[in-house]
């Protein structure tokens, strides 16, 4: 684990440098509109996502599609969870599917930006960075016949703790997940102050590295409180990873959209259309329905409309989904990982 933390910090640092240098390789096509997209991409139709390259020679039609899912928990868990779907995707597209485990949001975004990742599920917050900096085109999320269920930001504490409301946590140990996370970091900075608790002023967020790590840390007494995504927390309780009676919720937000599924903008349009068809004709088996809180299918979404509330949160926290914010957040994430590694390796007194 210590070695992985060190590797994560090193990788994030390298990504930070690579992002700066690669920005100079601007798209040479005549681009009428780019919006907040990186200079590698163009958005002539103003739908806020990258258009397919105008030069058809840049379209990709790989023999194997690389698929990843957001690292909200141990990546190995989701490799097994998604196996029924990746098997279906292979049969439906006629291509080999490679599941690519990622250990951080930054690693997943950089993998798509560099062309090593073709289809991916991104967490709610990092979706914006994936769109603007990696050319991701979100088209689906998990849902039911009634549409998208979404998730809530939960502020959780130990059930035997004295805390009853957010303002009780002033000066306490509060864990956030990672800098780019919506419910784990950005949304609390907007939603907590009206409830009497200001991150950075009333407490210094401790980056745990994930929603599962935050929840487990609260249960273990390492943290006094943590904002976590309700869908991740509910899956942990259902799986027995954490006992529901150990935890009490003292705050619950309005609904946010859950993780998006996106394809790389430079996939051959026929292939991108086929991938979407494969997503929408797949019905979740019982194992996936159980894992995803009753969701039984993929539901069509578009980034411009369905992520408006998330973009608003990002803007209000001073973390718009642009390169400067990404570089700052990635650097902070790398520093948090390095600090955590030092703490883990420090000799116990």
Regions found by a protein language model. Give the residues of each.
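Ligand-binding "clamshell"
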Residues: 130-142, 236-250
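Bacterial N-terminal signal peptides
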Residues: 9-20
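N-terminal hydrophobic or amphipathic helices and topogenic motifs
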Residues: 23-107, 291-349
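Hydrophobic residues within well-ordered alpha-helices
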Residues: 112-113, 169, 218-219, 261, ...
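Short beta-strand-to-loop elements that line the ligand-binding cleft
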Residues: 96-103, 201-210, 248-251
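Bilobed "Venus flytrap"/periplasmic-binding protein-like clamshell domains
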Residues: 67-90, 125, 148-216, 223-225, ...
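Periplasmic-binding protein-like
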Residues: 70-71, 145-154, 241-279, 286-309
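Acidic, polar ligand-binding/catalytic clefts
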Residues: 109-168
């Amino acid at each position: 684990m210590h070695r992985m933390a060190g590797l994560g910090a090193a990788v994030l640092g390298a990504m930070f440098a690579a992002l700066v240098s690669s920005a100079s390789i601007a798209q040479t096509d005549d681009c009428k509109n780019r919006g907040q997209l990186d200079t590698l991409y163009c958005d002539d139709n103003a739908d806020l996502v990258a258009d397919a390259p105008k030069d058809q020679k840049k379209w990709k039609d790989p023999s194997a599609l690389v698929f990843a899912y957001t690292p909200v928990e141990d990546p190995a868990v989701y490799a097994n969870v998604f196996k029924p779907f990746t098997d279906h995707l292979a049969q439906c597209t006629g291509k080999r599917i490679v599941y690519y485990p990622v250990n951080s949001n930054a690693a997943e975004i950089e993998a798509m930006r560099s062309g090593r990742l073709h289809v991916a599920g991104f967490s709610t917050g990092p979706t914006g960075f994936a769109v603007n900096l990696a050319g991701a085109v979100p088209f689906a999320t998990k849902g039911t016949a009634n549409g998208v269920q979404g998730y809530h930001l939960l502020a959780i504490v130990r059930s035997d703790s004295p805390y009853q409301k957010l303002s009780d946590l002033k000066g306490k140990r509060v864990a956030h997940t990672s800098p780019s996370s919506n419910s784990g970091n950005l949304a609390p900075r907007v939603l907590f102050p009206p409830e009497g608790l200001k991150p950075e002023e009333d407490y210094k967020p401790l980056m745990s590295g994930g929603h599962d790590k935050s929840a487990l840390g609260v249960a273990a007494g390492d943290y006094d409180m943590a904002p976590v995504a309700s869908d991740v927390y509910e899956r942990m309780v259902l799986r027995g990873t954490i006992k529901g009676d150990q935890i009490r919720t003292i705050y619950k937000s309005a609904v946010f959209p859950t993780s998006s599924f996106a394809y790389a903008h430079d996939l051959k349009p026929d292939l991108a259309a086929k991938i979407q068809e494969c997503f929408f004709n797949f019905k979740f088996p019982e194992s996936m329905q159980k894992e995803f809180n009753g969701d039984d299918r993929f539901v069509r979404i578009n980034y411009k409309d369905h992520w408006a509330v998330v973009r608003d949160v990002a803007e209000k926290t001073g973390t718009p989904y642009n390169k400067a914010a990404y570089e700052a957040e990635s650097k902070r994430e790398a520093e948090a990982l390095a600090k955590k590694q030092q703490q883990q390796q420090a000799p116990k007194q």
